[in-house]
């Protein structure tokens, strides 16, 4: 199991008994953590149906994970929202959103304005189809590489599978403010990747245990990051 590291030295581990190991546990945790309305449950169910159908046309998620889609993808995404419980309506930017994980799950469970950044056309077509089908008026899809997305202050930045950690942070630093919350699932390499960051960046983050995988961690941080200085051309 990942051993979480906090800047304040406190514990934040998830016990083996609390891990969401199956679909029933995942649904139960979603109910307990977010108390979704009937409409939200219907939206999540519809999203799952659309995701599975689209996965037969383009590779959005590993086919082997479909039988456990509620634990492996829905609860796995929703746990990021549980790590940012601050009140308010600040912009949430989801980088490399792919099939909308975690962005669309977060958007269904909250009213936070959501920007899904994805450069691949077919994935963006799917994202737009889901947004329209579920009437998620607070969600915007940016079909472009991150480097071409206009700078906007983000209350939250997430990235489930986007780029190596140092590059991810450097590319997205311009969206950060003093209060930005960073939520970066990094799998089994979370502690190792954190240790490789520049010292000032390391101090901003700690590792939270994933609720869906005993070997995975989520980097959680708060604050503004200055982009790396570029050499002159």
UniProtKB/Swiss-Prot annotation:
Chain ranges passing through the membrane: none
Keyword annotations from UniProtKB, A to Z? Cytoplasm, Methyltransferase, rRNA processing, S-adenosyl-L-methionine, Transferase
Q: Which GO terms describe its molecular function?
A: rRNA (guanine-N7-)-methyltransferase activity
Report the InterPro entries cross-referenced here: rRNA_ssu_MeTfrase_G, SAM-dependent_MTases_sf
Q: Where in the cell is it found?
A: Cytoplasm
Q: What is its EC number?
A: 2.1.1.170
Of the GO CC terms on this record, one is:
cytosol
Where does the UniProt entry say this protein principally localizes? cytoplasm
Q: Name one Pfam family in it.
A: GidB
Residue sites binding S-adenosyl-L-methionine per the record? 96, 101, 146-147, 160
What reaction does this enzyme carry out catalytically? guanosine(527) in 16S rRNA + S-adenosyl-L-methionine = N(7)-methylguanosine(527) in 16S rRNA + S-adenosyl-L-homocysteine
NCBIfam families in alphabetical order = rsmG_gidB
Q: Which family does it belong to?
A: Belongs to the methyltransferase superfamily. RNA methyltransferase RsmG family.
**What is this protein's function?**
Specifically methylates the N7 position of guanine in position 527 of 16S rRNA.
UniProt protein name? Ribosomal RNA small subunit methyltransferase G
Q: Which organism is it from?
A: Sphingopyxis alaskensis (strain DSM 13593 / LMG 18877 / RB2256)
The gene from which this protein is expressed is rsmG
